[in-house]
Amino acid sequence: MKGVSAAFTAPAGLSIITTTFAEGPARNKALSVYTATGATGFSLGLVFGGLLTEIGWRWVFFLPAPVALVALLAGIRLVPQSARPRFSRAFDIPGAVTMTGAMLLLVFTLVEAPAVGWTSGRTLGSLVGVAAILGAFVWRERNTSAPLVRLGILRSGSLVRANLAAMTLFGSWVGFQFVVTLYLQQLRGWSSLETGLAIFPGGFLVAILSPRIAPLIMRFGVTRLIVAGMTLITAGYVLFLPIGLDSSYAFAMLPTFVLAGLGFALAFGPLNVAATNGVAPGEQGLAGGLLNTSFQFGGALVLAVVTAVLNANVGSDGSPQALLDGFHAALIVSVGAGLLGVIAMTQRPVRQVQAQPELEEAFEEAA
């Protein structure tokens, strides 16, 4: 239920911003505030989530319900109504089923591969199945009058690079946070609250700095900010690699969370700008949906790889050092994902979107 709800609300929220504010300083500022509010919620969630688990884990799922109700009522009251479309559009159920099926099968295959073997018939057959389902999705989108994803939008170099960077940015962080949580709670014996407080500085920096990123977007452009942000985040992961069984928080962990906070503040807002600049108003929801799908799929994909690497490298004796060795190997996955994001953003687009006359100029501004 939460996943379906997020699939409806996240792209809609981004679309409301991009269709309400014109490209340029106003939209950049709005997206910076959007990033800051998300980071604030993330930071507070770490702390309050830890507190609530001290009462009982069910409270972690119950408390968001009244908060969501208040947000819904506020949205009905404050968000301006958009004009209804002049024509109704069919929903592409086959496209949604094939795309979702391909992503689920890929993640499942990566999770199960260490147990059944990377070259086993089951693993190879599943990968062939992923390719076949993706082929069916592309065929469907090319041959239906109401596609889930208009494939022509992928001619936008800025949008494609932003989505690749989103996958690696969020994926690397999800994988890193997974390993850090296991490290702190299993090896160091920290509570959920202590773990949340340990990670809190990163989210706090994002919440404080994100509203101030808009002027930097106008001065340096989104590509440079995204590359700088992802470089800082990846450097933070590298600093965490030598972590030991008794490493101090202040010197061995805090620098990573500070760099991650600075990096997210620099990269997240510009990613939203790069993914939506130059897109026609009627496709802002599609662009937002693609970006949020990239965030979520990247998180699931990298986490699956992290889990596979962790399980493959944990020693059989179950000693603390054996667990630590597995954590070190898994952290390399996040480093690699971060580097891939930097590489993706430094590649120049081959083609630009041709659906609207003004798009070429818009994408040059985004770069």
Placement of each model-derived feature along the sequence:
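12-transmembrane solute porter fold
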Residues: 13, 121-129, 133, 139-317, ...
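Short helix-kink/termination motifs in transmembrane helices of multi-pass secondary transporters
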Residues: 60, 100-109, 113, 171-182, ...
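A gly/Pro-rich, aromatic-decorated transmembrane alpha-helix motif that marks the paired
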Residues: 36, 40-55, 104, 108, ...
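Signature tryptophan residues that serve as conserved aromatic anchors
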Residues: 57-59, 118, 190
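Helix-loop-helix hairpins in multi-pass membrane proteins, especially solute transporters
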Residues: 1-94, 281, 285
